[in-house]
Amino acid sequence: MEPSRILITRKRSFKNLFALCLCVSVVGLLAGCDVQRRKSDAELGLNPQQIAGRKIYDNLCDRCHAPYSSRGRQGPSMKGVFRRQYLPMSGMPANDDRVTDVIRMGRNKMPGYSQVLNQQQINDLLAYLHTL
């Protein structure tokens, strides 16, 4: 093979390798875009009751219900749960009374928390859920 053809072939290989690396980098960056940085209580403008509810949510609910996405979780996302007319999966009205019942008694695979949370803690949790 002529030296000039070898040089052209190497340049093409380098360009293809560069294009492949660029594509892999872009895909990697886009995949990371779904991950949201956790905002502080102050950034979210939470009041003391909502902050207490957020702590309860983090300890008990976040395992199955992501606040902003359902990816990789068993339960539905809680984002905008009170902006919907009906609760996801159950179809019950989305209001404080119904959500309180679900928190206390559980539903489907979700355990009830009537023996774990008192009424004030449930109210705190509801206050936080209203912010999502």
Labelled PLM ranges:
Residues 29-32:
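C-terminal motif of bacterial Sec signal peptides marking the signal peptidase cleavage site
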Residues 73, 80-132:
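Extracytoplasmic electron-transfer domains, predominantly the class I c-type cytochrome c fold
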Residues 53, 57-67, 125-129:
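The canonical Cys-X-X-Cys-His
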Residues 44, 48-51, 69, 73, ...:
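Residues at secondary-structure transition points
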Residues 63, 77-80:
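Soluble periplasmic/extracytoplasmic beta-strand elements of cell-envelope proteins
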Residues 1-27:
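Short, low-complexity, charge-dense intrinsically disordered segments
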Residues 36, 67-68:
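Cys/His-rich metal-chelating microdomains
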Residues 34-56:
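Electrostatic cytochrome c docking/interface patches
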